[in-house]
């Protein structure tokens, strides 16, 4: 378990630093397009998590430390949107379309509502 925690932590640092670097670079070069870094890391993260998930399905012998380190740590540090996308896709693939679309809708609209509520609370 300690090796898994260490792998997730180390890879998480790398993913987080990459996300920070992307945001810093975009802010310095295109300040009006601040959202571009988030969009880029979300899309790249989705591509990476899809590749890793598919690769790990084909290679069950890959140790849990590597699996968790790369998916939970690195990709999770880079973006949590990729995990959300994979969860939705897995629900669809398992024939649970109603749950998948409910999850999608609640995540997006609930997230926007929760963010608005949090911002509103700071104005009280």
UniProtKB/Swiss-Prot annotation:
One of its GO terms (molecular function) is metal ion binding. It catalyses: fluoride(in) = fluoride(out). It is a multi-pass membrane protein. It comes from the Bacteria. Its main location: membrane. Na(+) binds at residues 76, 79. Fluoride-specific ion channel. Important for reducing fluoride concentration in the cell, thus reducing its toxicity. This is Fluoride-specific ion channel FluC. The gene is fluC.
């Amino acid at each position: 378990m300690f090796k898994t925690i260490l792998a997730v932590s180390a890879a998480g640092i790398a993913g987080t630093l990459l996300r920070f670097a992307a945001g810093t670079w975009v802010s310095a070069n295109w300040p009006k397009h601040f959202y571009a870094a988030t969009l880029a890391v979300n899309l790249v993260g989705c591509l990476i998590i899809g590749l890793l998930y598919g690769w790990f399905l084909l290679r069950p012998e890959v140790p849990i430390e590597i699996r968790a380190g790369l998916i939970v740590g690195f990709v999770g540090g880079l973006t949590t949107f990729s995990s959300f996308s994979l969860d939705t896709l897995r629900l669809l693939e398992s024939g649970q379309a109603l749950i998948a679309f409910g999850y999608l809708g609640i995540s997006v609209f609930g997230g926007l509502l929760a963010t608005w509520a949090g911002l509103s609370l700071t104005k009280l």
